[in-house]
Design a protein with these regions (language model features):
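N-terminal accessory segment detector
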Residues: 1-91, 100-118, 123, 132-147, ...
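A helicase ATPase "motif cassette" and its flanking acidic/Ser/Thr-rich regulatory loops
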Residues: 94
Length: 156
């Protein structure tokens, strides 16, 4: 599945998870359904990060540099428009100015869980990829802001 753009993977996942979430909400309540989805997505993102680290890391590069090299996959097909503010072996700062993931979830009537399906993955993916990488993000387009602020740091 490496050759499938990530935005297509997320659409396919959302087509399944949307109805599952609706049923969980009906039977368990919205809050419990969100908790279950949050934990499931977090675990999937950590596992995905571990897989990417095992298959896409170059020896001799910093963990964050390996991560930066992968970032193109999330942007594939115009999925994200970004302004890179700083890029180094221990810091990667950028703003997302257009997010087709957010647009896609809105079009699918899943905007209410889009943050769980995509945004929540970003920081937890790092835990699996290399736990020295951390993300600080103060705002997201999915949350109503004009841009998403990504501030990655890596302990060396």
């Amino acid at each position: 599945m490496d050759n499938i753009p990530i935005i297509i993977k997320r659409r396919l996942q959302a087509e399944v998870m949307g109805p599952v979430f609706d049923e969980m909400s009906a039977q368990l309540g919205q809050e419990k359904a969100e908790d279950i989805l949050r934990v499931a997505i977090q675990n999937a993102a950590i596992a995905e990060g571990q897989n990417f680290a095992a298959t896409h890391s170059s020896p001799g590069q910093s963990p964050l540099r390996n991560f930066i090299d992968l970032f193109e996959q999330w942007k594939a097909g115009g999925a994200l428009e970004v302004d890179v503010l700083h890029e180094s072996d221990d810091q990667f700062d950028f703003n997302v100015t257009r997010c087709r993931y957010a647009e896609m979830y809105q079009e699918m009537d899943l905007g209410h869980i889009g943050h769980l399906l995509s945004c929540h993955r970003d920081g937890t993916f790092c835990q699996g990829f290399d736990d020295r990488i951390t993300l600080q993000r103060d705002q997201t387009i999915m949350g109503g802001a004009s841009c998403c602020t990504f501030r990655y740091r890596c302990e060396t």
